Structure formats: structure tokens, C-alpha cells
């Protein structure tokens, strides 16, 4: 890509396909969501292909011994869940984590198959953000 992604998106110079985009609670210091909201809103105005937004906020087990130092859901912390590889990590995952992982694998698989992860698309009129957490 030869230009800034946000500039290309605003000008309609990105692929005209469905998008599923999201962030974790601590992506970019917790500031990642606003630019994603803008992208999804602009996308809904430019294309009939939807944009689906997610927000991963599961604080990973093993990082919560001292709540004052809890890093939150750091960048890439959702990857074990979305690829169904919790058993490859040292973390003390619970049954709820495995259920969350299963739901995320289902959503990504559904999106790859059909272009729809199983929740409403984000639009200016209906700003849906799917939250992934164990609670």
C-alpha cells in the first residue's frame, strides 16, 4: 500500500468486500476503537458490503495476580482464542475461556464462509460492536 490506510478508506480506494475489524481493550493504550468506529461508519456509507466490529476485553488469566498492574487485553491477546489454541499456552485458562474461544472460532469461520460473523454490521444508525469476554 502506498498511502495511509485511513486516507485510502475515506477516499474509497480499498477493496469493496465485507470487513471484520476490531481491537483489544488495551490496543494502542486503549485508544484503538475510535479509528475503527470511524472506518466502519465510513464503510457503511460507501459500500453495500458490511463492516463488522469486535472488541476483545478478556483479561488473560495469569496476568491478574495484582489488579493494580493488570495489563488488560493487550495487543494480540485474542489470537489464542480466535485460532482455538488455548492449549498451546502456559496460561491457566478456564472452561469459560474455552467457551469464549469456541464462540470466536465460530464467528471467524462464519465470516470466512459467508462474509457474516453472526452479529449485525456496524453502521452510523446501528453502531454494533460485538464484545468478546468471559462474563
Set out the residue ranges of the language-model regions:
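C-terminal helix-and-tail extensions that cap enzymatic domains
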Residues: 4-135
Amino acid at each position: 500500500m502506498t498511502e495511509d490506510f485511513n486516507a485510502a478508506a475515506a477516499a474509497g480506494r480499498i477493496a469493496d468486500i465485507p470487513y471484520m475489524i476490531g481491537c483489544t481493550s488495551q490496543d494502542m493504550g486503549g485508544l484503538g476503537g475510535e479509528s475503527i468506529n470511524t472506518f466502519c461508519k465510513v464503510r457503511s456509507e460507501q459500500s453495500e458490503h458490511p463492516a463488522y466490529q469486535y472488541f476483545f476485553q478478556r483479561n488473560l488469566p495469569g496476568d491478574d495476580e495484582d489488579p493494580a498492574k493488570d495489563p488488560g487485553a493487550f495487543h494480540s491477546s485474542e489470537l489464542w482464542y480466535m485460532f482455538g489454541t488455548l492449549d498451546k499456552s502456559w496460561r491457566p485458562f478456564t472452561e469459560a475461556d474455552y467457551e469464549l474461544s469456541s464462540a470466536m472460532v465460530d464467528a471467524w469461520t462464519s465470516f470466512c464462509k459467508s462474509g457474516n460473523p453472526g452479529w449485525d454490521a456496524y453502521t452510523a444508525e446501528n453502531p454494533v460492536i460485538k464484545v468478546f469476554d468471559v462474563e
